[in-house]
Curated annotation (Swiss-Prot):
Annotated GO biological process: translation
Alphabetized SUPFAM superfamilies for the sequence: Ribosomal protein L10-like
Protein name per UniProt: Large ribosomal subunit protein uL10
Lineage, highest ranks first: Bacteria, Pseudomonadati, Pseudomonadota, Alphaproteobacteria, Acetobacterales
Biological function: Forms part of the ribosomal stalk, playing a central role in the interaction of the ribosome with GTP-bound translation factors.
Disulfide bonds, paired cysteine numbers: none
GO molecular function: large ribosomal subunit rRNA binding; structural constituent of ribosome
Keywords: Ribonucleoprotein, Ribosomal protein, RNA-binding, rRNA-binding
Assembly and interaction partners: Part of the ribosomal stalk of the 50S ribosomal subunit. The N-terminus interacts with L11 and the large rRNA to form the base of the stalk. The C-terminus forms an elongated spine to which L12 dimers bind in a sequential fashion forming a multimeric L10(L12)X complex.
Gene Ontology cellular-component annotations: large ribosomal subunit
Organism annotation: Gluconacetobacter diazotrophicus (strain ATCC 49037 / DSM 5601 / CCUG 37298 / CIP 103539 / LMG 7603 / PAl5)
Amino acid sequence: MPGRSRRRRELDRTEKREFVASLAAVFAETSMVVVTRNDGLTVADATILRQRVRAAGATYKVAKNRLANLALAGTRFEGISPLLKGPTALSWSADPVAVAKVLVEFAKTNEKLVLLGGALGTQTLNVDGVKALAELPSLDTLRAQLVGLISTPATRIAGVLQAPAGQLARVFGAYAKKDEAA
């Protein structure tokens, strides 16, 4: 029996190393991480939260703080390590606004989910910073607005360029009618 528990511990250590490595890889690729306290969150509420986070293209993960701190070490998100105390969860996304919006909205309706802070790139954010980020339009909305701003001058230029040609055509048409009448 003693050999069996040693094998299980080795397996646990291997699983933990793999988890830390996968979390570190996520931190290397993502642009935003938010830390929340989920003390007392029911399974049903957690399931709803996960679904909303997933629908926004983000991830919500409850992780052991010690393992999360190991994964954060040496990354640009290292500044959020002090937030990892007690029952916490990490959320991340490539679109920083999406994950912040979902978590802020859910925290408004469920007091068991408490925002602790986060990080956007190398910038550590407090709770107010995460809430301010949630107020911004999403990345897709900003892209659409930018395309609209870029295309508006082009359509105006095309309209201006076409106007003289139309005026010339009307002038030539008037001369042609005048010559036919004469």
